[in-house]
A protein has these predicted regions:
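ATP-dependent carboxylate-amine ligase catalytic core
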Residues: 3-4, 12, 18, 24-45, ...
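C-terminal lobe/tail of nucleotide-utilizing enzymes
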Residues: 46-49, 53-55, 76, 87-105, ...
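Short internal beta-strands
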Residues: 73-81, 148-151, 232, 305-308, ...
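Conserved catalytic-core segment of NTP-binding enzymes
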Residues: 153-155, 161-162, 180-182, 189, ...
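Walker A (P-loop) phosphate-binding motif
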Residues: 186-224, 228
Length: 401
């Protein structure tokens, strides 16, 4: 007997795992935790599906998880184009021991067991799955893998996937699925009660490396003894394991600033951090997306780091729209929000190391700001950028030496 769609949706209404207490003020990221981690201290295993997109802009979820993952032990990446190669070497020219395989069967052979999770690692502009993608996810479910998806198309709204989850006794996690509208918060202005510096990592385009730069900066300052909290605003950083987060582009626009403000306030009250770093999305100048505006409104940053890809001529997935200049983006950000750009970070796509270093020197002279590339240059350049802008951070770093 087929179970009704209404009953299926009721069963799977909660696509995040709830805490034992029902405090409505708890951040969504604290509630979301893979089932295997909820009941088992061992980090669960996962494979990432990224066919024909690994190391490309639409493969940014897979790219991010290969570089950094707190929630999962990444066992392999599925992309037949690079099968047999090392994921770290393909992505960053540095081997990391994560193999790339051609299909699910090879991933299982490589892992010598069925992984706990199948992560859909592609982030298409449409936010939707193709028919082939759906068949592959259903196949993974039939092999007893739980599913993690960061798309706007929610699998838990599809009776086909709900029935499969019951049939195979697996879970589905729609990372972008927002809270009930009655639980959403509007902006209150209490963000100004947050006394520690708040740095937003913004950019001149989407899929530019803002999350990577924010993560590297958070890790480095934390390793120096500072208490630094990264506020995640996109699906990849939530999947990576950020504790405080909101998938901002899935929140109704009226509540975007308030939801981000609420998460920052909770991080500040719970953690008493020295510094809060906010992951940026898209670009304030981008004609297709508005998330950057909500990030500036909701976080009211005391400083902005701007990421730019000098060799990118047109906006990602928008070949008719030229990239903005660094100067115009800085002017727009500083006009739109009561903040200042404290430094520039580069995405070195299409550039040699020598070209990157040359442009760093040129931009430093042109803008009078600290300029670096978080992936190819010494990470100390990032910490210097922050310490130069915020004397209290410089003092705390000096105390920790």
């Amino acid at each position: 007997m087929s179970i009704s769609t209404r009953k299926l949706r009721n069963i799977f209404k909660l696509t995040t795992i709830e805490d034992t207490d029902n405090n409505d003020d708890s951040p969504r990221s604290t509630s979301w935790l893979p089932l295997a981690q909820k009941f088992n201290p061992v980090i669960p295993s996962a494979i990432i599906y990224c066919e024909n997109n690994f190391a490309k802009t639409d493969g940014k979820t897979a790219n991010g998880l290969v570089r950094h993952s707190l929630n999962y032990r990444i066992q392999s990446v599925i992309d037949s184009e690079y099968a047999g190669l090392d994921a770290g070497e393909v992505l960053d020219n540095k081997k990391n021991g994560i193999p790339i395989v051609a299909n699910i069967e090879e991933a299982i052979i490589e892992a010598e067991s069925v992984p706990d999770y199948f992560i859909f690692g592609i982030a298409p502009t449409s936010g939707c799955l193709s028919d082939l993608d759906k068949r592959i996810i259903l196949h993974a479910m039939s092999l007893k893998m739980n599913i993690v998806s960061g798309l706007h198309e929610f699998l838990t709204d599809d009776p086909l996937f709900l029935e499969a989850s019951l049939k195979y006794n697996v879970k589905i996690f729609d990372i972008r699925k927002p809270k009930d509208k009655r639980e959403l918060k509007t902006f209150s202005g209490k963000i100004h009660d947050v006394k520690c510096p708040r740095i937003a990592v913004m950019g001149t385009d989407c899929a530019l490396g803002k999350r990577t730069t924010a993560t590297i900066l958070t890790k480095e300052l934390s390793s120096k003894g500072l208490k630094v909290i990264l506020i995640a605003t996109g699906q990849t950083s939530i999947i990576q394991g950020a504790r405080y987060c909101v998938a901002l582009d899935a929140v109704p626009s009226q509540f975007c600033a308030g939801e981000l403000e609420s998460v920052i306030l909770q991080a500040y009250e719970n953690e008493k951090p020295d510094l809060i770093i906010i992951e940026g999305q898209g670009a304030l100048s981008h004609p297709a997306f508005s998330t950057s505006a909500f990030i500036l409104r909701g976080s009211c940053p005391t400083g902005v780091i701007l990421q730019h890809a000098p060799k990118r001529l047109y906006r990602s997935d928008f070949p008719d729209y030229p990239m903005p200049s660094i100067a115009s983006e800085i002017n727009l950000i500083e006009t739109f929000s009561n903040t200042s750009v404290i430094g520039l970070t580069l995405n070195h796509e299409g550039m040699t190391l020598e070209e990157t270093r040359s442009l760093i020197d040129n931009y430093t002279a042109e803008f009078g700001l600290t300029v670096t590339d978080a992936l190819t240059q010494p990470v100390q350049h990032l910490t210097h950028m922050v310490a130069s802008a915020f004397p209290q951070i410089a003092s705390k770093l000096a105390e920790k030496r």
